[in-house]
């Protein structure tokens, strides 16, 4: 049996099924534990010091307790504290990004996704670099400065080289109201070497959604 280790490079250790189940059980057992919830809210509170603002943060188990809480007044306290933390670190602003879908070719069979390989009811499209450029100009005209590029998992149609070419194209567009400042990337999990290539290309954030951490459900859905 794998042992939970959040710093491990092995997926089965940092995404550990036993730890996830135990965390959920712990949260359910403590979701109405007022004393514990109060202590967690206090722990999460931002603190001002000489160098700015710091926050102790919460462990995943502690965060799970707050997420499971069903006490209305404590939930309201969480909303207020969340806003306090947000203002302390980010100020009174909201950062938005626009999705840019590059390709819906995909070799996976995820049952919840319209891109899945058995779906014969959609046309498969892969943008050329000129089409990418046109999309970027259209998004800039709307006022967007940050994008999140999206692509299905297909090593033939959507190799990392294609993704990198698209990133370079996006950053190269200098339109009347400026250019794109940040390209976030939402593609399938890849190799360490490819992550390095993405970093060298100047991406902002790499996004990887895990629709479920329930092992049984994951196998059924994928």
What do these predicted regions represent?
Residues 55, 82, 110, 149, ...:
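Conserved, mostly hydrophobic/aromatic
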Residues 73, 80-81, 109-111, 162, ...:
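Surface-exposed beta-strand edges and their flanking turn/coil or helix-capping segments
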Residues 62, 98, 104-106, 217, ...:
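Solvent-exposed, flexible loop/coil residues
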Residues 15-18, 60-64, 75, 112-114, ...:
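Generic detector of short, locally flexible boundary/turn motifs and exposed helical patches
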Residues 91, 95-131:
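Canonical Radical SAM [4Fe-4S] cluster-binding loop centered on the CxxxCxxC motif
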Residues 117-222:
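Core AdoMet radical
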Residues 65, 73, 103, 107-109, ...:
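A broad, structure-centric signal for solvent-exposed, well-ordered loop/edge residues
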Residues 1-100:
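Flexible, acidic/Gly-rich N-terminal and inter-domain linker regions that tether
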């Amino acid at each position: 049996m794998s042992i939970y280790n959040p710093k491990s490079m092995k997926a089965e250790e940092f995404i550990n099924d036993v730890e996830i189940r135990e965390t959920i059980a712990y949260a359910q057992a403590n979701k109405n534990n007022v004393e514990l919830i109060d202590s967690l809210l206090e722990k999460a509170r931002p603190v001002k010091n000489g160098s700015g603002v710091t926050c102790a943060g919460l462990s995943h188990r502690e965060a799970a307790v707050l997420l499971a809480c069903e006490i209305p007044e404590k939930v309201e306290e969480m909303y207020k504290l969340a806003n306090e933390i947000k203002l302390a670190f980010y100020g009174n602003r909201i950062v938005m990004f626009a999705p840019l879908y590059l390709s819906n070719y995909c070799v996976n069979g995820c049952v919840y996704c319209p891109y899945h390989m058995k779906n014969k009811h959609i046309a498969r499209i892969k943008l050329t670099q000129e089409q990418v450029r046109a999309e970027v100009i259209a998004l800039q005209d709307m006022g967007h400065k940050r994008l999140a590029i999206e692509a299905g998992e297909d090593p033939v149609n959507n190799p990392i080289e294609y993704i990198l070419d698209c990133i370079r194209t996006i950053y190269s567009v200098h339109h009347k109201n400026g250019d794109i400042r940040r390209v976030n990337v939402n593609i399938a999990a890849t190799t360490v070497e490819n992550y390095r290539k993405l970093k060298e290309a100047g991406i902002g954030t790499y996004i990887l959604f895990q629709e479920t951490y329930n092992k049984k459900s994951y196998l059924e859905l994928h």
